[in-house]
Amino acid sequence: MWVMSQVRSMEPDLTLAAVYQAAANLTEQDKEIFAEAVKTAFSVCSSAAPSARLRMIETPTQNFMFVTSVIPSGVTSGEKKTKLNIDAALDNLALSFANKKSKKMARTYLLQNVLRTQDQQVAISGKYILYTKKHIETSLMIDKTKLVKKILEYAETPNLLGYTDVRDLECLLWLVFCGPKSFCQSDSCFGYSKTGYNAAFPNLLPPYLYECGQNNGLFFGIVQAYVFSWYSDFDFSALEISERARRRIRSLLYDLKQKFAEQEVSVLSVASQMCIFCALYKQNKLSLEYVSGDLKTSVFSPIIIKDCLCAQTTISTTQMLPGTKSSAIFPVYDLRKLLGALVISEGSVKFDI
């Protein structure tokens, strides 16, 4: 393995011929291709992590990699466990947000991100969003204390390089998982019709947020975008929380507003505040409208529940996608069966399928 020890700055040395002549006879074209590959890779890495310190590692076989700080895979048993101290906000969550919304007799449906044209009949599908049964069960849990603790224990590992400019990570996680805007905003949320529940289900977040121990920078970047999108204009004065908790929330939102002051957050406030059942309901409608010919052009990323296939009743396949040999698949889920299989008990949520 060859290491460019002579490079002292963050700018890569694109004249690699001297290094590789000792290991292989490269043509001028090979050198140009390799130099362009290094330059492109460095640009991508710098854009993804502009403040990261990069090191380039080369091999004699015309391969290379850029490495940065390594994130630990976990914490040792001897480390101090992080405790929630948000002034019992989780315990008071049900009381704070228990006010029911007015129900609508008929479910309304509004197409999101849909373009209607007269000369095209193509459903343009984005990447599928894959959820496991465990992801869905975690998303529907009211008390996510264990999840928050697990994330904090990993995120606050000593000697971990800075990955977020928000000081109060605990408050950040509380707002995204358990705050007043973390519940489905649909007036006809399926949670109101679930026997023994009778309230709005929690919002469905990206599956990545129900895991921990991966890329902290990406994880907290997504969480910050959601919290800023949901709460930047939210009035916390009416909430039954302690004054100390209120100060922590104000301080956190100030940090986020400073960060996103010159940026456009791409998270859609309305589209992101929807439970799994309401999201699948809209997906079913969108798929059926396309099949019936009522929908001309659609842009969306279908949700796939990987290990709940028995709850899937129909697959609607579109025409061949233009310029490819592939076709988009739009699953239609039996929501009544899924909702009936949902077992909610104190401290746990399970699908009995």
Swiss-Prot record:
It comes from Human herpesvirus 6A (strain Uganda-1102) (HHV-6 variant A). Belongs to the herpesviridae UL95 family. It holds the Pfam family Herpes_UL95. This is Protein U67.
